Amino acid sequence: VEGKISIGCGEIAAVQLLPKIIESFRQKYPRVTFDIFTATADLVKEQMDKGLLDIGLLLEPVDMVKYEFIRLNIREKWVVLMKSDDPLSKKETVSAKDLSVLPLILPRRMNVQSELASWFGNYYEKLDIVFTSNLSTNSAIMVNGGLAYSLVIEGAVSFWNQSKVTFRPLDPPLTATSVLAWKRGQPFSLATTKFIKHIKCFLGMDKP
């Protein structure tokens, strides 16, 4: 078995599963390589629909009608990015009231914005939204430049050097779930078919 398997994923905590899944798979099939594409769930789904990506690791809420999927037992935590020397960093958590008077960067995905709107409640209509962004890395650069505070999934953020930009969890906590998905009825390569089987076995959804 050989070939390339393409995986699309966001900057979310569930990505930490991929090294273990891929490593154990490549012990059986060392001639299989992987391509990782980083984007939001909407763009990953679009690429999957076009047959350009085999598998997606998606942050919910997301419409899964056309896909087979496994919901992962990992809680994705929402946090606010800020400069490390910001007065807000002295707090253990950040509330909607705290953020209601600050310039903000929000996620680009509309269904995710709806989740955040529910969390903000009455404060949402009064927010000073500077811009929206699809990935947290560029948002962090804007935060470091003093432009705004950014609401992001903790995900990869915890791996960053926090000497310039740090984060604090929201209060009350806001969490989400993620799914591993592939398009239903898609004719996959042998390598991808075996990898999907391996994922199911690895996560205890199927027998080897």
Model feature map: region roles:
Residues 60-61, 84, 111, 154-156, ...:
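Short secondary-structure boundary segments
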Residues 2-64, 132-135:
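Central regulatory/effector-binding core of bacterial HTH transcription factors
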Residues 4-8, 56, 81, 105, ...:
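Short, well-ordered beta-strand segments
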Residues 59, 102-124, 188-192, 196, ...:
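Secondary-structure junction motif
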Residues 7, 48-49, 99, 140-147, ...:
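Hydrophobic residues within well-ordered alpha-helices
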Residues 20-24, 41-78, 82, 118, ...:
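Short beta-strand-centered segments that line the small-molecule binding cleft or hinge
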Residues 68-109, 175-188, 200-204:
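Hydrophobic/proline-rich hinge and linker segments of small-molecule sensing/allosteric domains
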Residues 13, 17, 166-208:
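A late-sequence structural motif
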